[in-house]
């Protein structure tokens, strides 16, 4: 649901009118598409207050670079699109920090979390040769990018807690 275009009270009202049993109301929020953080907070507050629901941002991300690594058009920045933060590691930190702060300020402690998403910002390439066989050199390069730019570093640090998985799936993607 886009908090910039939809009044969440309308959605929550329809769910309520149809006796839909749910615990948490979830929103997507991408700063370059979905309007202001004030609007997001107002929308989440309406659901939390009027329907006594916990709320989350279930999907967000922000770019660390605007370089096109894979030959596919980037979601942002696009012509005419204004970015509220710089395309940098610090811009990503600032974006996520502001979103987390906004959700934490939802009335009555009903803002319970933020989930970060969007591995498409990691510019990995195809790890296969034209004949379909695995190219070990390209795979190693992709793993290095995931280790640096994805959650690979977090998976590596978690090896002591889950040694059977941490080095196998590289963060799950």
Positions of predicted regions on the chain:
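Noncatalytic carbohydrate-binding groove/subsite architecture in carbohydrate-active enzymes
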Residues: 1-76
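Aromatic-rich peripheral "rim/lid" segments of glycoside hydrolase catalytic domains that contact
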Residues: 42, 46-49, 65-98, 102-110, ...
């Amino acid at each position: 649901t886009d908090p910039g275009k939809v009044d969440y009270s309308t959605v929550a009202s329809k769910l309520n009118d149809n006796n839909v049993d749910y615990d948490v109301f979830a929103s997507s929020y991408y700063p370059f598409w979905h309007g202001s953080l004030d609007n997001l907070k107002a929308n989440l507050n309406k659901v939390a207050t009027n329907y006594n629901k916990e709320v989350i941002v279930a999907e967000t991300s922000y770019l660390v670079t605007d370089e096109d690594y894979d030959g596919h058009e980037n979601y942002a920045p696009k012509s005419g699109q204004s970015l509220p933060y710089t395309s940098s590691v610090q811009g990503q930190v600032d974006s996520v920090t502001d979103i987390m702060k906004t959700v934490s300020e939802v009335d009555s402690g009903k803002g319970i979390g933020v989930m970060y998403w969007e591995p498409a910002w990691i510019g990995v390439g195809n790890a296969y040769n034209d004949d379909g066989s695995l190219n070990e050199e390209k795979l190693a390069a992709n793993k290095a990018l995931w280790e640096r730019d994805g959650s690979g570093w977090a998976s590596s640090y978690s090896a002591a807690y889950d040694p059977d998985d941490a080095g196998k799936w590289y963060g799950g993607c």
